[in-house]
Amino acid sequence: MIQIRDNTFETNSSSSHSLIITDFDGKYTPEEMMKGIYLWEDKETRMYESNLEFYRSPFSLLATFESKSRYAIASSQGHLADEVEKIWHKYIPNFNGFKFDMKTEEYDYDKKEWVDLDEPKPIYGGTDDYQIEGWLKSYNVSLEDFLTMRRYMVVCDGDEYREWYHILDSGLVDKSHIIHDSEREVAEEWKRKFAKENEK
């Protein structure tokens, strides 16, 4: 492990996504739940590939039911898509399911070429790290609580930008409300291990 930027330790990715847990109480109101949600005539919600991409740029703070739902789908490589959909059925009136962009071919790394699929597959987007399932397990948070409660947010940042920490250091945000910042906690743990290894 090599420190290549101030206060940044290089791992296997250049993203700095973080689960933020605050002391904010309660769930979103029904009106807040609907923010960013559009139901088409068939009462389905379109999940476009371009809206399921969360990388190190641009900087984003995901703090709505809708945006966290998209992140959960993308960051789990689609593993949580069905569970997210069930939660939407519970909270979004008249919701009739997600409709994803589909792919008809994918890259075969053994053959080193694109191959046609027998059947189209949903495109679930992507992230650099695919951390959502690990976060929920590590902090003992259910997917439903993560999506519906105000206290959970996600920061999408890059370690070459560090926009989130520039914002925190500016004094614009009251940091006293932040209980956990997963990326910072992991970085601090790496620093402790690095320091301990150098003592030997």
Where are these regions (language model features)?
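Long, non-globular targeting/processing and low-complexity regions
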Residues: M1-I2, T8-E10, S15-K200
